[in-house]
Amino acid sequence: MELWRQLNQAGLVPPGLGPPPQALREVSPVEIPGQTLRTAGADTGGACDSLLWIREELGNLRRVDVQLLGQLCSLGLEMGALREELVTILEEEEESSKEEEEDQEPQRKQEEEHLEACPAPHPPDFEMMI
């Protein structure tokens, strides 16, 4: 499974998750050329046909499992690439916000100086009794 290997090398395999089952990593016995189902003796009431059907269905299920595993691995690799892209975007936004803060610093200082020049509101110097 090349995609699984790529996923593992990218560090995207969840911790504790081992390799795929051996049945998905090896060539299916159904796919081995020259391999046939042999029975000793006479056909016992269609048992051979049933076994062939079961074997064929198991092979179909295995193919579907391999396809699904491949799709999951592809999806994992794509998610890893998107995660890296997101990290890059967030870093760029952080840098631009720092630059904006640095650009706004002189303006803030001017506003503070202006506020210091204006006297703060305070209560009147006289008292009134009723």
Swiss-Prot record:
Q: Which domain of life, per UniProt? A: Eukaryota
Acidic residues composition bias: residue spans = 91-104
| Segments of this protein annotated with the region Disordered | 91-130
One Pfam family of this protein, by short name? DUF4530
InterPro entries per record: DUF4530
Q: Where is the composition biased (Basic and acidic residues)?
A: 105-116
Record protein name field: Glutamate-rich protein 4
Which species does this protein come from?
Homo sapiens (Human)
